[in-house]
């Protein structure tokens, strides 16, 4: 396939045009008075959104050279979104400001490599300053604030705060469609997995068709149980305690199942058998999770634990177990809290290491079940377009809130980035030459988001910045929604520190790459051959 090439200044200018086209479409959405963008879809109704990453992802430019620049900005937005769940528009505005200023200097003869070095040093200092300005979330009210700002809705903020309140910081919160017009939170307490009773004869509540076991002993094994002989010793021990028994195994059939059912029907031993959740390696991990949660052991050949040798101490315990046709919920597991914490930390480490999205989701789900429950936010709306938009806002707000819990909050409205210039200012005294110019590029760009927020709300950005910098209070800023100045923390205008940090780091990374680009290579578009027309006599 033949290629087209562009070199030096011509290449960089083409990239800049692509960057500007995407950034100009995205930056009008920044701040409380940002506008919406309507995106045509090849199927279904158009999408109305003010989410930076959604807009950027939809843009594909006709000019292949410009499109390379557009793709780089998309990368800034999606990388920030993946890491922090928000701040995509801020990242785009920062990237555009750094690229514009940087290209001016490269055209004037500055060394791109030294510029990049200066940019990296300045960003490092600014990030340190952001960390200093951050403070930990103090409770439910702060969580509601962060979520409300991200979603642009106090109601959504309250829903997310309620969900987090119930499942804790590590709990899983999922977003699903509601069957009604209402948006509400549904909560599943304890550990739940998608496996029900093997036989309906185990049912204790005929009306609800479910098994309820109070304070049961829990036998956990990764084997298939068919013969009854290995089970007899432990069944006798459990029967003597008068407590019910839950058996979780790869499968229970034949003699083993018959014995459990008969004992239940005779009233000798109330019990229930369910299949183990998951498959393969995931099944082993989930059985181990259940064992740690309930304080039991997995009877497994791999671990050298035989069914015949099991004692009552090897069985798990819980306050209550509910088993339906296709789900089991274990409430109030009696496992050692320290062991549970260690297991959660282990799963957290695995989440950070994995690159697979599916793997990440299953690990997060496992972690939530250990942490104490799953909350589902059911989203309702009158139309499909509204539902899509609302669901998207809730998912974004959820990610931003998690980021805030992780690294704390900073004053919002672009104030933190503006205040972090102080650290870059000190750095400028230490640098010289093109490195100093690189740091100045970052210094200038740090005021771009607040200027854009002010302009979107109809104010003069330069005047707003001057007034903010006249105050010594690091949290003093401008409320663009009401047109007032004041302490951003007191006004509830806050951002997750992780969002602000990620936006700056990702913008600088792409800007540095673009400034050091000398050649663009794209595929030459194929010329469409005209279809020959048929002779007239046909």
From Swiss-Prot:
One of its GO terms (biological process) is protein refolding. Signal peptide: none annotated. Its main location: cytoplasm. ATP binds at residues 29-32, 86-90, 413, 479-481, 495. CDD domains: GroEL (cd03344). It comes from the Bacteria. It holds the Pfam family Cpn60_TCP1. It is an enzyme of class 5 (isomerase). Keywords: ATP-binding, Chaperone, Cytoplasm, Isomerase, Nucleotide-binding. PROSITE patterns: CHAPERONINS_CPN60. It is found in: Cytoplasm. Its EC number is 5.6.1.7. GO terms for molecular function: ATP binding; ATP-dependent protein folding chaperone; isomerase activity; unfolded protein binding. It catalyses: ATP + H2O + a folded polypeptide = ADP + phosphate + an unfolded polypeptide. GO terms for cellular component: cytoplasm. Together with its co-chaperonin GroES, plays an essential role in assisting protein folding. The GroEL-GroES system forms a nano-cage that allows encapsulation of the non-native substrate proteins and provides a physical environment optimized to promote and accelerate protein folding. Belongs to the chaperonin (HSP60) family. Forms a cylinder of 14 subunits composed of two heptameric rings stacked back-to-back. Interacts with the co-chaperonin GroES. This is Chaperonin GroEL. It comes from Thermotoga neapolitana. The gene is groEL.
């Amino acid at each position: 396939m033949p290629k087209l090439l562009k070199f030096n200044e011509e290449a960089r200018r083409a990239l800049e045009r692509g960057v500007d086209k995407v950034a100009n479409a995205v930056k009008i959405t920044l701040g409380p008075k940002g506008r919406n963008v309507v995106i045509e879809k090849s199927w279904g109704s158009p999408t109305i959104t003010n989410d930076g990453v959604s807009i950027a992802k939809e843009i594909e430019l006709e000019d292949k050279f410009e499109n390379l620049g557009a793709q780089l900005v998309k990368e800034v937005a999606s990388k920030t979104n993946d890491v922090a769940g928000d701040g995509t528009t801020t990242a785009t505005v920062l990237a555009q400001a750094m690229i514009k200023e940087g290209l001016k200097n490269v055209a004037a003869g500055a060394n791109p490599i030294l510029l990049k070095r200066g940019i990296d040093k300045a960003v490092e200092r600014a990030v340190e300053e952001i960390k200093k300005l951050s403070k930990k979330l103090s409770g439910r009210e702060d969580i509601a604030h962060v979520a409300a700002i991200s979603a642009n809705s106090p109601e959504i903020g309250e829903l997310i705060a309620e969900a987090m309140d119930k499942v804790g910081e590590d709990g899983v919160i999922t977003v699903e469609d509601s069957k009604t017009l209402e948006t509400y939170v549904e909560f599943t307490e304890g550990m739940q997995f998608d496996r029900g009773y093997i036989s309906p004869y185990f049912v204790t509540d005929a009306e609800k068709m479910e098994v309820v076991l109070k304070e049961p002993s829990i036998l956990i094994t990764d084997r298939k149980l068919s013969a009854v002989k290995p089970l007899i010793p432990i069944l006798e021990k459990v029967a003597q305690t008068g407590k019910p028994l839950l058996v979780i195994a790869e499968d229970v059939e034949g003699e083993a199942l018959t014995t459990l059912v008969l004992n239940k029907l005779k009233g000798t031993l109330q019990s229930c058998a369910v299949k183990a959740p998951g498959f393969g390696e995931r099944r082993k991990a989930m059985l181990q999770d259940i064992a740690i949660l309930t304080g039991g052991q997995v009877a497994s050949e791999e671990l050298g634990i035989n069914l015949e040798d099991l004692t009552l101490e090897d069985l798990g315990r819980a306050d209550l177990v509910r088993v339906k046709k296709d789900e089991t919920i274990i409430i109030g597991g009696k496992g050692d809290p320290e062991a549970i914490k260690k297991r959660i930390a282990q799963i957290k480490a695995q989440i950070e290491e994995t690159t697979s999205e599916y793997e990440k989701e299953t690990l997060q789900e496992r972690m939530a079940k250990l942490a104490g429950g799953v909350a589902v936010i059911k989203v309702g709306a009158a139309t499909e377009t509204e539902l899509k938009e609302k669901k998207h806002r809730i998912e974004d707000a959820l990610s931003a809130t998690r980021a805030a819990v992780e690294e704390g909050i900073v004053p919002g409205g672009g104030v933190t980035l503006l205040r972090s210039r102080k650290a870059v200012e000190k750095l400028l005294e230490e640098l010289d030459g093109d490195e100093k110019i690189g740091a100045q590029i970052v210094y200038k760009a740090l005021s771009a988001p607040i200027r854009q927020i002010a302009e979107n709300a109809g104010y003069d950005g330069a005047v707003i910045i001057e007034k903010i910098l006249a105050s010594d209070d690091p949290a003093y800023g401008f409320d663009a929604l009401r047109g007032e100045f004041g302490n951003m923390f007191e006004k509830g205008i806050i951002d997750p520190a992780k969002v602000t940090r990620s936006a700056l780091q990702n913008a600088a990374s792409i800007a540095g790459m673009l400034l050091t680009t000398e050649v663009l290579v794209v595929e030459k578009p194929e010329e469409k051959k005209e279809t020959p027309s048929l002779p007239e006599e046909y």
